[in-house]
Each structure stands twice: as C-alpha cells, then as structure tokens.
C-alpha cells in the first residue's frame, strides 16, 4: 500500500513540477517551431536551471522526435 502511495505522490510531484516550471523547458505545442530552436540552443547553464521533471520531459520530447510515429504526423 505504501509503495502505491509513494508512486502516486511521485507522479503528482512530477506533474505539478512540470506545469509550474513551464518556462524552464521549451515543450509548448503553441510555439512548436520556436520550441525546437530553443532545444537546440540550450547551454550548460540552462541545464543547471532544469528540474528532474524537466529532464524527463526533454527525454520524452527527444524520443518523440526520433520516433517514426512522429514523422507520420507531419
């Protein structure tokens, strides 16, 4: 029971961190073209400002860009 509670709290923490730090990562679909340019322009200082949830989202974003399913959407 406690492991399920811990997992739920971790997931909620990641989601809350994701939505409250939206300016820290360029994953907004509203500015899709700008987001790709900002991803390319991240430097070391930008990585120090990111939180763990942001790294998860950046990894998901990179995997989506590499996947063939994403290519079919264009």
Curated annotation (Swiss-Prot):
Q: Is Disulfide bond among the key words of this record?
A: no
Q: Keywords in UniProt for this one?
A: Antibiotic, Antimicrobial, Secreted, Signal
Give the UniProt subcellular location, in the record's own words.
Answer: Secreted
Biological process (GO) annotations held by this record are:
defense response to bacterium
Query: Where the protein is mainly located, per its record?
Result: secreted
GO CC terms in record = extracellular region
Q: In which tissues is it expressed?
A: Expressed by the venom gland.
Q: Where is the signal peptide?
A: 1-24
Key word Secreted present in the record? yes
Q: What does this protein do?
A: Highly acidic peptide that may have antibacterial activity.
Give the family this protein belongs to, as stated in its UniProt record: Belongs to the non-disulfide-bridged peptide (NDBP) superfamily. Long chain multifunctional peptide (group 2) family.
Protein's UniProt name = Peptide BmKa2
